Amino acid sequence: MKILLIEDNQRTQEWVTQGLSEAGYVIDAVSDGRDGLYLALKDDYALIILDIMLPGMDGWQILQTLRTAKQTPVICLTARDSVDDRVRGLDSGANDYLVKPFSFSELLARVRAQLRQHHALNSTLEISGLRMDSVSHSVSRDNISITLTRKEFQLLWLLASRAGEIIPRTVIASEIWGINFDSDTNTVDVAIRRLRAKVDDPFPEKLIATIRGMGYSFVAVKK
């Protein structure tokens, strides 16, 4: 899952990039507002983290221009903490507003909340013959209905929505169970095994791949 970070403070940019990368996200980071707007319009990002005070073009201008073309979720970062500034940010199209200084754990929680909310709006997912509906929690593959538990559904959605990415066990444990990963715990591996029994085993082409020492990945196949 790809996130765009537009932040001109080098130290903030580096530690946010490192933290989000360790959490399993792919990060593009730029420090100039014009470069940020160019990337935001050119590429399809799952989320944009946007500083307000930027060289080249400020965050307000970026938001206004972006909202004429896209509805990508945006979290604003700024040292400006007045009520008027927060209202302006939200009225300009920001989905959330985080005042500096902030803890990375809070930023990560807000990132995950925005991504969950955005996924909820996109209620269906279709890939490689797999069809999922997040409203009815129905799943089918090649028009064959599959019954999953709620956690299995969430796990499959996480993998399929990030097809082609390697998702570490730590990220899966945090996203699905809200727990810190313990190397002595096989919760994730057991859940993947049960999911494969329903989604992969009855079919000749396998969708869930193990990337040894790294995690799991959803393999898109041509239909």
From Swiss-Prot:
Alphabetical list of Pfam families matching this protein: Response_reg (PF00072), Trans_reg_C (PF00486)
Organism, as annotated: Escherichia coli (strain K12)
A GO biological-process term: negative regulation of DNA-templated transcription
Annotated Response regulatory domain residues: 2-115
Gene (UniProt): hprR
Cell membrane is among the record's keywords: no
UniProt DNA-binding region: 122-220
Molecular-function GO terms, alphabetical: DNA binding; DNA-binding transcription factor activity; phosphorelay response regulator activity; transcription cis-regulatory region binding
PTM-bearing positions, type 4-aspartylphosphate: 51
Record-given protein name: Transcriptional regulatory protein HprR
Misc. comment: HprSR and CusSR form a unique regulation system, where both two-component systems recognize and regulate the same set of genes, but under different environmental conditions. HprSR plays a role in H(2)O(2) response regulation, while CusSR plays a role in Cu(2+) response regulation. Under low protein concentrations, the two regulators recognize and transcribe both hiuH and cusC promoters, albeit at different efficiency, apparently in a collaborative fashion.
